[in-house]
Amino acid sequence: MKNAKMIGFGLYTPKNLVENERLQEFLETSDEWIRTRTGIERRYISLDENTSDLAVEASKKALNQAGLSAEDIDLIILATVTPDNFTPSTACIVQDKLGAKNAWAFDINAACTGFIYALKLGRSLIRSGEAKNALIIGAETLSKALNWEDRGSCVLFGDGAGATVLTSTEEDCGIKCVNVKSDGSKGDSLVIQGLPLNSPFKDGREVSENYINMNGREIFKFATKVMEESIVEILEKENIKIEDIDAIIPHQANLRIIDYVVKRLGIPREKFITNLQNYGNTSGASIPIALCESINEGNLKKGDNIIMVGFGGGLTWGAALIKL
């Protein structure tokens, strides 16, 4: 049976690197305060590149590594909560900028779980024969959705993009399993408001503040619970043991969340790949950035079994088992 195999990887960040100390210039915070509570030391903040620009640069690297041209791609799925516009989709903008004229393209919004959702869709479309070569992207410019006066949230996030090329294969490798879930009843724990209803037929005017609004305590409880459950479910579904897993790539939100799950599951800490100290929380881009960086630095190799696990707004969560 056909499967979807990852053959190209690319990541891209803006040039503007912001160390924790820079935030002290306008916030009541410190490097120590941020590091001890989150593990984050620095992040990249875009000055003039939008989400599509970051996605294009990451995609070019992935295509180059895959040995494919943009015209070889017949599907583009872009996971983001910070699109360039409401419409057209950022994926369509990326399609145009890349010259991927043979691809159909669309965005998905599953917040920090977006890349996992996109992998599930890409895999399904390849397995069904609807696509042969798919470009799967996670890209965010979260800096434009931050309240830069709120030290509890603005210190957490960064901008960036990660991309991978999937192709159809008969080999015993690729995306082995993907589980995704949602719970809209708790969606108000993490919100970026949309446009208010302000027609002339409505009494009064609504004001919307389009900033990330997060209940940190609720998100911590949710994240630690579903990360643990998602890893266990993947292992049980595929009838494999944690000893068979070479690496786990979690959503890069907070080191406290990751360390809590490590302790709960009794998994060796070295199995968990973390790089949030250098990027912050890049939402839908965090898992592909960590994946691409690990592969490009030689920390992951062909034949490795990897679990990627995410959680985010929606609420959404899920995990994928990959054999490189």
Swiss-Prot record:
Region spans: ACP-binding: 252-256
Key word Magnesium present: no
Gene Ontology CC, one term: cytoplasm
Record has Transferase as a keyword: yes
GO molecular function: 3-oxoacyl-[acyl-carrier-protein] synthase activity; beta-ketoacyl-acyl-carrier-protein synthase III activity
Catalytic residues of the enzyme: C112, H251, N281
Example GO biological process: fatty acid biosynthetic process
Key words of the record: Acyltransferase, Cytoplasm, Fatty acid biosynthesis, Fatty acid metabolism, Lipid biosynthesis, Lipid metabolism, Multifunctional enzyme, Transferase
Cited SUPFAM superfamilies: Thiolase-like (SSF53901)
E.C. number: 2.3.1.180
Broad class of where this protein is predominantly found: cytoplasm
Pathway where it operates: Lipid metabolism; fatty acid biosynthesis
Domain of life the protein comes from: Bacteria
Catalytic reaction annotation: malonyl-[ACP] + acetyl-CoA + H(+) = 3-oxobutanoyl-[ACP] + CO2 + CoA
Alphabetical list of Gene3D superfamilies matching this protein: 3.40.47.10
Subcellular location: Cytoplasm
Domain notes for this protein: The last Arg residue of the ACP-binding site is essential for the weak association between ACP/AcpP and FabH.
Family as reported in the entry's similarity comment: Belongs to the thiolase-like superfamily. FabH family.
Subunit comment: Homodimer.
Entry function: Catalyzes the condensation reaction of fatty acid synthesis by the addition to an acyl acceptor of two carbons from malonyl-ACP. Catalyzes the first condensation reaction which initiates fatty acid synthesis and may therefore play a role in governing the total rate of fatty acid production. Possesses both acetoacetyl-ACP synthase and acetyl transacylase activities. Its substrate specificity determines the biosynthesis of branched-chain and/or straight-chain of fatty acids.
Protein name (database record): Beta-ketoacyl-[acyl-carrier-protein] synthase III
Source organism of the structure: Clostridium perfringens (strain ATCC 13124 / DSM 756 / JCM 1290 / NCIMB 6125 / NCTC 8237 / Type A)
